[in-house]
Structures are given as structure tokens and as C-alpha cells.
């Protein structure tokens, strides 16, 4: 048994959750519930009133956080302590969006200064490309960026660029490549002109298998299209720690942007990994993105637990996973530009908190990270929302929507909002058997058939959700929103006493993948692995079923 689950607050909360009435009753008992259970910070508004909680629940949740010494753990992260214990690293992605005047010391060095120097390097590069001063090997301006990465060096820049589409420069387009499947890069390159294409290779080691394979294929394509090895420097830049390998590839040392070991991949979009974002929206908007995240950092670091937005959201996720057996959490974005966020939050949360031992190696005796999934409203309402309303699993939901649209066309946004708010109400309220039967009162069906149909139309309700609103989707509010989910993820991991900043499952997959790669090109049939793996390898080598 872990210390966490034996704590008084945990055990009291366990008993308390079983006695809470339906949310309908909670709303009837408190006409000011919306006011009492909502908060604002950093341009975001959070309505958490549609959760299975009352004042006592909140008090117990905060007690669980206090028992886990959450506040001291938050300070430890911001102070640069080695909280990534398995890799003996500090966790300082927050330094990437620090204000220039802030001082964050690590090993006697103010790393904010290093970050600022990198941002200045980025700005010079962005200005050169955007102005047309940076030219390809035939003297033409760059029109297309191909960003090659994997994991955090791919998903973060892609999703943020997608979200900030209204702020894109008219001079540039960007294409993102991650999957090692050749079809991905081949289709991306088909319409492009090598003379006007710039490649950004993002890999800390300059050796990540998928990224290096795609980059080598991009280089081959570039030379096949008329470029030369000598021209590579005009068309390839890198974000990496391995300067030697990058220069061997042909990249000019001046066009290599640094990475640091105190930033994990899934937290790296704020660094030079975000170069594609900066190229598309400009450095002013990129800095606004950083500013919004920094504002959320300050809120998280300095606000009491009871008013702290990431803490509140993290505690609710813990509540449902550990006390209501919720195995997944759905993120529903009611904004087309935010359609990629569920996938980004999926990586952030599941790679961080998909762990089964505590910091000291003890096996946990409770659930940890849930499955994060979701999609774009209103599309999901005609698909998986059915399961949310009437399925047997409890699936907490986050609804995210800007109050103003970038495209105020007719009644579109009003209808979007009505669907968003209507879904949260339906999940909370449900429909009783009596209500369903009453709706059928005017039909000519026999009484026994009405009864059966009414049972099919019953929805239990009491399905929890948060609603996050912002005035408008801007670089600043987007930065705050992403940082909110980063810190929400931290809160859960800190209370569970797991390491949210390593990813040994990912590393094992890489190792075994490389081992299989060698066997796929061997002369003899595979016999050394399990019979299933041997069979699959041999079948692939024969290229037929």
C-alpha cells in the first residue's frame, strides 16, 4: 500500500464520494453554484460547476493535495530542482517562456539568458526567410517549410501552427513530416519545388531513427530535383544538440539551433523546436504565445491551491480516475482551429503519467494516467457522444470554446455555442424515465411499447464536465491554455508520486524496434525471438501472406 492511499484525506474522500447526490440535486440546492464553482485566469474562464463535487468534496481534494505536499513540489520544479529523478535532470520548460528580466539559475548559470540568445537567433532567421533575403540555391525566395521531427518535436509545432492559422504569413506554407512510412514524406514533397523549399530537422541527437530517415530522404529528393551537396546549407537547418552530426550532414553551424536536456520533447514547442510556428506567425506572435504560457506559469506558481486553475483541473481528473473508476478523459474543442489539441494533450498526459511505480520504485495501488482522447465539436455529437450520454463507462469531459470566432459567418458561431453548452447540460442533467415517458404521451403507441421506448431514451446524467472559455483564440490565450494542461498533468503526477518527465516505455520501443530492423535485413529466417515475432519478421521478408 502506498502512503498516498493510506492518508486520512484520501480515505475520507473515498467514503464521501459514495454519498454525494446526483448533480441535479447539487444544482437545485445551490442557485449560485455556477458563481461558486468557476474561476478566471490568464484570459481563460473555467466553469467546473458540472462536476460531482460540493464544498466538502473540494475541501477534501485540497487536503489530498496538501498531504502530497503539492505546493512544495511546484516550487521544486520552478526552482530547477532535479525532479526528473530517473534521468537526474531538472524540468524547466517554464524557463523557455520566462520574461527576459527573470533569473532562473541552473548549475550556476542563468538559463534565461541562454533562452533569450536562442530567441534572438530565431528572430534573425525568421526575418531573413520572411523578408525574402534568405534565398534558395537558384536565388528564389523560400515559399514552403518542411518540418521533420517526431513526438514532441512534431506534434507541438504542428498543432500550434494549425491553431494559429488566422495569424499565418501569406508568404509561407508549412508541411509537417513525422511518420517513417515513406508515403508520408513522398506525398508531402510531391507538389513542392526544391528551389523554394526549406527543411527544418528537429532531433536532439540528430539520430532519431524516423527523423533521420526522413531527413536523408528529403536530402536525396532535394539533390534529385537539381540541388547539390553544396546547396544543402541554403535549404536545411537543424534544431539539435549534436552540432557535429548536423554539420557533417551539410548544415551551416550558424543555422543550428540548440536544445537542452532540461526540456522534455513534449514540452519543447516553446524552444527552437517552435521555429516552424515562428516562421508562420512571426516572432511577435510567437513571443505572445510564450507570454500567455508565462502568465499561466505565474498563476500556477503563486496562486493558492483553492483558486489555482491547473490544480483544480488536476484534482478533478484524480477524483474520477481514483474514486469513480474513470479510465479515460475526453477533450472536446468547439473551434475548428483547435481540432488538433486532443491529440496534443493525449501525448502530453499519457506519455507523462502513463506510469506504474512511484519515485522510489514502489508499485502504485491506484490508477494513474487515463486514456486521453477527443475531437472537434460538433462532429463528435454525431458519433461518440452517444457513448458519453448512455454508455456504461464514466468519461469526464472538457469542453473548450472561444466566445468570438475568427470567421463570424451568419449564425454559425451561435449554433456552435448552443451545441457546446447544450451538451454540457445534457451530460449533467440527463433524462429520467418519467421525463421520457411524458415526452411520448402524445404518441399513439400502446402503453407497454411506450414504456419500452422510454427506457431506451433514459440518460442517467451526472456525467461530469469542465467548460473552458476564452474571449478569442489568440497566440496569448493559446499559450495559456497549453500551459494550463501542462501544469494539470504535473499536478496529477506530483500527487501520485510518479515521475511525469521520463518515458521508459517509449525508449524500450525504440530499442526493440532497432533490434527487429537488423533481423529484417538478415539473410536467414528469424528464429531467436518469440514465435509470433519470428513469424511476422519472416512474413515481411517474403513480402506476401
Swiss-Prot record:
Record GO biological process: gluconeogenesis; glucose 6-phosphate metabolic process; glycolytic process
SUPFAM superfamilies named in the record: SIS domain
Main location: cytoplasm
Single GO MF descriptor: carbohydrate derivative binding
First-tier enzyme category under EC: isomerase
The protein's annotated pathway: Carbohydrate biosynthesis; gluconeogenesis; Carbohydrate degradation; glycolysis; D-glyceraldehyde 3-phosphate and glycerone phosphate from D-glucose: step 2/4
Keywords attached to this entry: Cytoplasm, Gluconeogenesis, Glycolysis, Isomerase
Active-site residues per Swiss-Prot or TrEMBL entry: 351 (proton donor), 382, 510
EC numbers for this chain: 5.3.1.9
Record-linked PANTHER family: GLUCOSE-6-PHOSPHATE ISOMERASE
Protein family: Belongs to the GPI family.
Function recorded in the entry: Catalyzes the reversible isomerization of glucose-6-phosphate to fructose-6-phosphate.
Protein name, as recorded: Glucose-6-phosphate isomerase
UniProt organism field: Shewanella sediminis (strain HAW-EB3)
